[in-house]
Amino acid sequence: MLTAQRVGFYLPSCALSSYSSQVYPVLFRFGSLLIPSYGALAALGVLTGLLLVQRTARVVGVSPQQMWNLSVLSLFVALAGSRVLLIAVNWSLLRMHPGWLLGLAMVHHPLLAAVGAALAIGAAACFTRWQHMRWDATADAAAPALAIGFAFEQIGALLSGAGFGTPANVPWAVTYADPLAERWSGAPVGVAVHPVQIYCALAYFAIASVLLYWLPRRQQQGDIAGAWLVATGAVVFFTEIWRDRVGRGEIFEKFLDGPQIAAILLVLVGAYLLRRRTAAAISGAVVIAGAGNE
């Protein structure tokens, strides 16, 4: 039986210390059982995204059941594939500590996210082709849900210390007090840092709101997906300015890091998609006008 002494509940403190508020990597504690903040918020983001994509699928004319199957398949492939890579890279350590396998789902790293995203895109492409789904309409339906999911994931990252920010001397800075934040994510304990994850989360919520408003009013298929790619790339690129770069890869004499390179690619792909769709619409309008003149 659980007692008040054996149950801990952790959330960001609303009270500010001299410079910052504290955040914690453990959301719930039931005796020796820990519920990590990152895993709980990421799961909430997945659930919210799955529920939302059922509604957006109807708006774009895609079967909600097909969209559900596509989403679940992509999530499974992304998680399983990235964890297999993690096991392969750390096989010698995991052989000595097999119990660590239970915590692999909670590990967060930009490389794992990139591998998971690539695998998910591949799985989604195969599924849409197999099910004869329109890829542009499917991408439009998925975009707002992905933005919502990323927002919750970033809130979880804030609480756990994953992707922590650079040292800051601002009233809204956060400080990690739990040693688990350092052990799990490498976050500095006792140092006030930028809550860069909240910057991202707020931006993603704003993107999702705009896309949901725009979705039923879009002029052509693919507009929402293209806009999401451009906006997401811009958010990632600029928020990396306040994110600690340890373990994120750097090129051009530390001018850019790995996520910023990925962000540039997202913007380019999104811009190409929007330009291609716009060019096609203009071409169609010219053909129609020419036929009318005849």
Q: Model-found features: residue ranges?
A:
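A feature for loop-to-transmembrane-helix boundaries and adjacent hydrophobic helices
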Residues: 9-294
